[in-house]
Amino acid sequence: MNNQKNFLIVAIFLSVFLLWDKWGVTHVVGANGNLISQTKIKDASTINNSLTNKNLNASSIIHRNAELDLPNTITKNQAPFTTVVTDLLTLEISHKGGTIQNAWLNDYPIEINSEQKFQLLSNKADEIFQAQSGLLPQGQTPTHHSIFSSKNSHYQMDGNSLVVPFTWKSENGIKVIKRYHFNKNSYVIGIDYQITNTTNNTLNITSYTQLVRNALDQSNMIIPTYTGGARFDDQDVYEKIEFEDFNDQPKTTSKGGWIAMIEHYFFVAAIPDVNQIHTYSSKIINGEYLLTVVNPELVIAPGAIVTLPSSSLYIGPKEQKQINNVAPGLDKTVDYGVLFIIAKPLSELLNWIYSIIHSWGYSIITLTLLIKLAFYKLSEKSYRSMAGMRQLAPRLTKLKETYGDDKQKLGQKTMELYKKEKINPASGCLPILVQIPVFISLYWVLLEMVELRQAPFWYLTDLSAQDPYYILPLIMGVSMFAQQKLNPPPPDPMQAKIMMALPFVFTIFFLWFPSGLVLYWVVNNILSITQQWVINKRING
């Protein structure tokens, strides 16, 4: 099996993979890795919760079925806001609804050496992305439209935790304290409500959280990353929801679960109480996209003071060390594609290597070397087949000259030659096919790892960005050309011209690839050339 056929195998496999991966975007992934086709049902006009009874404290508080009409109008926050600064986050929380209207990630500058931090949540008109939450029914309790008060306009985390309260009072004696809970070294924000019912009537309460954003797509043709919604349920089913499908999704119920708005490297997730049954929905309003989770309705007795079950928000990067223990299935927001079963162990191995080496560039090189060692025997078989074919090239050319007009005779004589020399031209196929899924998986690992964002290596300042001097793509092109020279030229002149052009085509294509990916390809090519050269030398004596 010569190298030219290997290139064709890679091209065909990549085409099939990209089609499969695109199909997988609109399908559901179960915990066992099975793909479950998504049934689209028109969004209902009401939310029906089927709930179980549960005492929250000594007062008479029970779950009951509820039909709710959420205040869906999206409003731009013009109210005063309170600034909250933790070790990882800087937030602006509007007094209108207690909505987190702006969020910056302190450890992630927008550019290298920039004082400006990456902004994930925003109240800018053309970049709306907010986390809204509130209580229902509207009028009796505060929604994300209601005006809260805050004792301070600025909170700074000085210890290991911080609580930021917002207060709302009704005219008839209902008091609500909405509290945000922050912990050091965490992007998780807890939310709870303390409700005081001083009226003579029972109070029917339902809490909700919704994520709102526009459909700003941050992906491109060279780097195809996912931007859109997602949800996870108690059946361990993870489902992507593309923006154009928001109005077509059915309402679902789940014990626990979560919803999220995802983009490259970062995401925001709303995570309700794991012990309750919640209703999830999505919709499009005025060109903006909403993912909503509604919690069970509660009946609060007159005179009772109750704290509702807490929920959480995750506002931050797709760091595995941060998200692994936040909620079940949250690690699926790191999009490894359809080969996640292979990609996730590779990601964990790469992180483990980094914990020892403390350099992402050298970690990629080390991982490439380990993968090459793991497939050494398979690669050796392929390269031996190539070397054997190279030795037979003059004799095959002579057979073609002799029997060129008789295709049947040429095929017969060619097979006799293979049999005599004990060479199977197809023996190199299996090693290549086995290694391709690993290459594709590592591609997605390096593409999705936020840890590579702005990670330096030698002259490179950011392994997630293209090589600014195009050194690695040029080395990659040269290595491909050198690898071709180790193999016999194709007998067909047209095929030979195509193969000669491939290094130039790939070089141009890789100019815009993240340098971390190109680094992997270059190292892999150099190791392959070395291995093939050694094998050729042994065979040729």
UniProtKB/Swiss-Prot annotation:
Keyword Transmembrane helix attached: yes
Keyword match Protein transport: yes
Alphabetical UniProt keywords: Cell inner membrane, Cell membrane, Chaperone, Membrane, Protein transport, Transmembrane, Transmembrane helix, Transport
Membrane-spanning ranges: 7-27, 289-309, 356-376, 430-450, 463-483, 498-518
InterPro entries linked: Membr_insert_YidC, Membr_insert_YidC_N, YidC/ALB3/OXA1/COX18, YidC/Oxa/ALB_C, YidC_ALB_C, YidC_periplasmic_sf
Entry's Gene Ontology molecular function annotations: membrane insertase activity
GO cellular component annotations of the record: plasma membrane
Source domain of life: Bacteria
Membrane topology: Multi-pass membrane protein
Main location per the UniProt record: membrane
Gene Ontology BP, a term: protein insertion into membrane
CDD domains: 5TM_YidC_Alb3, EcYidC-like_peri
Locations listed in the record: Cell inner membrane
Record-stated family: Belongs to the OXA1/ALB3/YidC family. Type 1 subfamily.
Quaternary structure, from the entry: Interacts with the Sec translocase complex via SecD. Specifically interacts with transmembrane segments of nascent integral membrane proteins during membrane integration.
Protein's job: Required for the insertion and/or proper folding and/or complex formation of integral membrane proteins into the membrane. Involved in integration of membrane proteins that insert both dependently and independently of the Sec translocase complex, as well as at least some lipoproteins. Aids folding of multispanning membrane proteins.
Protein name, per record: Membrane protein insertase YidC
